[in-house]
C-alpha cells in the first residue's frame, strides 16, 4: 500500500549520488518537498478515521454474524468470513501507518517495522484480492454444476491456505529490499537530525518495475478478468434457464391454440341475474374446494323441440331419459366436479407466468448486484495501481508539492473497497443479512 509513497522518497533520494558541488548548488532543500497535504491534514485525519472505523466495524459485524452459525456455514460464507478478516488487516496495517508517514514526513516505528510493515500491508491487500477471485470461481462452479456440488470444508481450508501461501510468496521481496535512511545525511541539514525514512532499496530500477508490473497483474488485471468472466457466465446461465422456461410456456400455448382454437373465438354471452349470483357464490366459497376442483354453472334449459323429437328413432327415448335423469341441475346453484389434467392447464400456465416474473425480477437483481461488484473493484483500485505505474516509469509527471496529496486520494479510494465489501458480500446476501439483523438486535438489547 505504501509503495507509491516510497517512490516519492526514492525520487527524493535519487540525487544522493551527485557530486558535492552539485549538491550544494542545485539539490533542493527539504522545504521544497513541503506538500499541499499540510494544508489539509485535519481533513485527512477525519476522513481516514471515518473510513477506517467504517471498514473495521462492518467487517467485524460480518465475522461475528458468521461465527454465530458455524455449524451451517457454506463454502461462500467461509470465503466471505476470510475476506472480512483480510479487510480488517488491511484497515489495521495500511491506514494508520500510511497516514502517519504522510503527515509527519518520517518513519517513526523503527528499523524492524520498516522491514515487516510493508510486507504485511502488501500481503493483506493481496490476500483480500485473491479471496475475491476465489468467491467468483466458487459461485461459477455452483451455477455450472449445481447437482454435483461436492465442495466441502476441507476444500475451503485448502483454498484459503493456497491464497495465503501465494500472498506470502509474491510479497516476499519487500522485507529484503527495504531500508531505513537518515534524512540528515541525505539533505545535509542539522534540522533533520534523528529523522528517518523507510524506503525501497532495489538493486536496479528494472527490479522495481518488474515487481510493480507483477503486482498490477496479480492485484488488479487478473481479479478484474476473473470477476468479469465469472459473473458474466452466471448471468448468462440464469438468463438461459429463464428463456427455456419461456419457450416451453410458448410451446404449450401454441399447442393449446392448435388443438382448441374455439376457446379464443367464442362469442361473448351476457349473464343473467341468476348467473351473476352463481358467480358470486363461486367466488365466495372457492376456498372450500381443493385446487383440483372447479365449479361451473348449469347449462341453460332448452325449450322442447317437438319436430326434432318426432324425427328421432323410437329406441332413442330410453337413452334420452337416462341422460336427462343423470344431468339434472338445481337452478341457480353451481355444480362442483374434479378438473381433469388437461382442463387445469390454464391454472398451470398462470402459475408458470407468475414464477417466470419472479425469476425475471430475481435475475435482474442478481445482474445489478454482480455489475456493482465489478464496478466497485475496478473503480476503487484502478487509481492506486495507475498512480504506481506512472510514478515508476516517469516520476516527474507529478510535482513534489502535490505528490502526497494525489497519493492520499488514490489510497483512500483503495481503502473504500474495504468498507464496501461488507455491504456487497454481506448485507446484500440474504442468509448473512438475516444473521446480521438478529446480531444487531441482540447488541442493541444488551
From Swiss-Prot:
Segments traversing the membrane: 43-63, 78-98, 118-138, 157-177, 209-229, 370-390, 408-428
Glycosylation sites: 10, 17
Cytoplasmic compartment segments: 64-77, 139-156, 230-369, 429-446
Extracellular side: 1-42, 99-117, 178-208, 391-407
Organism domain of life: Eukaryota
Bridged cysteine pairs (disulfide): 114-198
Lipidation, S-palmitoyl cysteine type: 442
InterPro entries with a match to the protein in the record: GPCR_Rhodpsn (IPR000276), GPCR_Rhodpsn_7TM (IPR017452), NPY5_rcpt (IPR000393), NPY_rcpt (IPR000611)
Key words of the record: Cell membrane, Disulfide bond, G-protein coupled receptor, Glycoprotein, Lipoprotein, Membrane, Palmitate, Receptor, Transducer, Transmembrane, Transmembrane helix
Major place of residence: membrane
GO cellular component, one term: GABA-ergic synapse
Localization per Swiss-Prot or TrEMBL: Cell membrane
Task of the protein: Receptor for neuropeptide Y and peptide YY. The activity of this receptor is mediated by G proteins that inhibit adenylate cyclase activity. Seems to be associated with food intake. Could be involved in feeding disorders.
Family from the record: Belongs to the G-protein coupled receptor 1 family.
Protein name: Neuropeptide Y receptor type 5
Gene name of the record: NPY5R
